[in-house]
Amino acid sequence: LGVYESATGQSISLFTYLLFGIPTGIILFAIMALIIRLIAKPDFGKFKNFDVSRVLDQQGPMDLREKVTVFVFFLTVLLWIIPGFLKLFIPDAAFVKALNSYGITFWATLSVVLMGIISIDNKPLIDVRDIVNKHINWGILIFISIGVYFGSVICAEETGVNAFMSAYISPLISHVPTMAVVLIIAYAAVFMTNFASNVSTITVMTGLGVALGMSTGVVNLVAISMVTSFCGSAAYLMPSSFAVIAMLHGNEYSSKNQIYKYGIIMMLLTPLVVTLIGYTLGTML
């Protein structure tokens, strides 16, 4: 979404993305659950005597440090969502415009500062110096930052991508249904992210999608940006696609045959759902 913001000068609020992503995600999750239940048919016999209350009792009650941390976390999430929500009803209000101008990075940074300042039992909620020095993967952070700028460069007028698409791509797709164009982009994003990294996929595909929309007007800029962001995160297959998939490949309870079989099924279904449901929702936002 940062690529869209860099290219257009406008932002997509987290609330807007949630309106797009939650219904789409729920439908995909339901499809995946049905596939697992009806086709994979896993053995749930070991869960018959599983006692949830026993696990909760072992955790014990939350202490003050945990409660304050949870409060700051949910406050941050609310501050991410509320500006976009208010913008739907009172878009011209000065304080709403001010809240939306900050972006999600400001509130995330503010929450880190708060947790670094708030001290309980003479210890801050988080040790910022320790986290910065030992727990932040600076390589990944720099890679993501470069990726966002790379995506915005694709959309920039100086690179000539928009002019190329307007001159050569626009005539080719002028008579192609919009949903077909979106479906092709969605499939490209899903297949690319499952064999490469999601960051590079989202960067490239969002950049191309926005450039296509700006040069031809065939696709809705907001909707296509959310489609490529969602599809670029739909990792199901290869270890390189996402950390959780890499963990799944190394888990004793899963096999590569299962991962490939059901992963490919989801790779084929995800673009269809995101295009038919997600893109349609995105054009309304």
Predicted regions located by residue number:
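Hydrophobic alpha-helical transmembrane segments in multi-pass integral membrane proteins
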Residues: 75-83, 143-164, 213, 223, ...
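Juxtamembrane and boundary regions of transmembrane helices in multi-pass small-molecule transporters
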Residues: 5-71, 85-90, 226-285
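Interfacial loop-to-helix junctions that mark the boundaries of transmembrane helices
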Residues: 10-23, 59-64, 89-106, 130-136, ...
